[in-house]
Amino acid sequence: ETLRQELVGELALECLLGNSTPLYARLYGQGLINSGFYYGYESYPGVAFLVAGGESKDPGAVRQAVWDEAARIGREGIDGGLWQRVKKGVYGGKVRSLNSFDTLCVGQAQAFFAGFRFLDFARLFDTITKAEAEDMIARWTVRERTALSVICPKEQ
């Protein structure tokens, strides 16, 4: 179950914030994010969260845009073509990462301590549905469950 949720989280984030999404293109085009924008899914015993970060001239506008897009996905769903592209891309990235001895070792160790088998991602991946990713986005990316931290340069 932990591995499944991690995979759903990764796919959900790629569909919401990935660099091939309309939201990313809009935010980048408006200069609200730059190429240093990042996002990820983290989980630990008893807690899991989605995170996004980077430099922005208006972090509040980025947060609002993410809320708005998450709400839209909750109402309308993820575009089917985007879902297929993201799913293939994420799977390909996971398979490519197996070429890295470090990634393989760290992944297996983390999975062992989390109670699952690292290489089971291949078996589970095809069973993950668009509806699961849509549900995660709709439930997790709401005002009551988000926080914004802004770090400003020290005045000189």
Where are these regions (language model features)?
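His/Glu-based metal-binding/catalytic segments typifying zinc-dependent metallopeptidases
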Residues: E1-P22, R26
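Generic solvent-exposed, charged/amphipathic alpha-helical segments
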Residues: G9-L13, Y24, W67, K130, ...
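Residue-level signal for short amphipathic helical patches enriched in basic/charged
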Residues: C15-N19, I128, R143
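M16 family metallopeptidases and their MPP-like homologs
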Residues: Y24-R75, G80-I128, R145-C152
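Proteolytic maturation boundary segments
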Residues: K130, D135-Q156
